[in-house]
């Protein structure tokens, strides 16, 4: 075993993965709960999908549960998704279920990858490709390049649909806002768990031609309430976006 063999294996495998994912059916930005669920259902439905995550780890806000207590809650309407993914839970009354946030995050990631979604971590989306009034791809760079402010030109990824799953900041939609292509991003409202969960799913939609918003990004775009450590809306939002996109792609 030589060190160069290890290096060559890593470089060749990653290069081939990246090359194979420069042209996609769907590019998802953000590997949080809604993004990974969307990736799972899209891949399962036969679409070519990749998820781009700027952080080193995937999972978004799942890991820390609530105030560091690594448990989260999911409501009855999303329980079937937990069952499909094989996540364990315990009923705590009123149609609520408590589960281990570590199991949830790791299982969502594993199931998405096993279904065929490719996850690229440490890759940040610095802009969008917009042609003829439609989002048609991503402008990507390494997260460390973005963090250090180095003047390094990016690469692009082509996609028939882009999904903004970047959470509270709706960071991908912000690129459209600053160009005047969408009118406003009100940001999320004060805490109201029940209404926030309901509206998260309701506002999961195509917010601009070629661009869907899911999860807390959808909430931020609609000015809907935040909901705290209940994650059913995130799961349902990802599934809803995936099924709508698959239908539009004729899958």
Swiss-Prot record:
Gene3D superfamilies with a match to the protein in the record: FAD/NAD(P)-binding domain
Superkingdom in the source lineage: Archaea
Record-listed glycine binding positions: 226
One annotated GO biological process: thiamine biosynthetic process
Binding locations of NAD(+): 34, 53-54, 61, 125, 151-153, 216
Pathway(s) where this gene product acts: Cofactor biosynthesis; thiamine diphosphate biosynthesis
Cited InterPro entries: FAD/NAD-bd_sf, Thi4_fam, Thi4_prok
EC top class named in words: transferase
Catalytic activity: hydrogen sulfide + glycine + NAD(+) = ADP-5-ethyl-4-methylthiazole-2-carboxylate + nicotinamide + 3 H2O + H(+)
Names of the cofactor(s): Fe(2+)
Protein family according to the UniProt entry: Belongs to the THI4 family.
UniProt-recorded name of the protein: Thiamine thiazole synthase
Gene: thi4
């Amino acid at each position: 075993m030589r060190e160069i063999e290890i290096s060559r294996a890593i470089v060749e495998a990653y290069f081939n993965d990246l090359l194979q994912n420069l042209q996609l059916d769907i590019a998802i930005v953000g590997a949080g709960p809604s993004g990974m669920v969307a990736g799972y259902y899209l891949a399962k439905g036969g679409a070519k999908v990749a998820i781009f995550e700027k952080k080193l780890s995937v999972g978004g806000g799942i890991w820390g549960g609530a105030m560091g207590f690594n448990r989260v809650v999911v409501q009855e309407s999303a329980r079937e998704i937990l069952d499909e993914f094989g996540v364990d839970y315990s009923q705590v009354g009123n149609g609520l279920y408590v589960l281990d946030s570590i199991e949830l995050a790791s299982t969502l990631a594993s199931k998405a990858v096993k279904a065929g979604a490719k996850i690229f971590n440490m890759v940040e989306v610095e802009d969008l490709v917009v042609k003829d009034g439609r989002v048609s791809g991503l402008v990507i760079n390494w997260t460390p390049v973005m963090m250090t402010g180095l003047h390094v030109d990016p690469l692009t990824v082509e996609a028939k649909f882009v999904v903004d799953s970047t959470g509270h900041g709706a960071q991908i939609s912000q690129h459209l806002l600053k160009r005047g292509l969408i009118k406003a991003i009100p940001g999320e409202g004060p805490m109201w768990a029940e209404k926030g969960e309901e509206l998260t799913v309701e506002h999961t939609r195509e917010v601009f031609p070629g661009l869907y918003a899911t999860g807390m990004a959808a909430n931020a775009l609609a000015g809907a309430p935040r909901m705290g450590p209940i994650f059913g809306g995130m799961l349902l939002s990802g599934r809803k976006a995936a099924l709508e996109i698959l239908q539009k792609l004729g899958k």
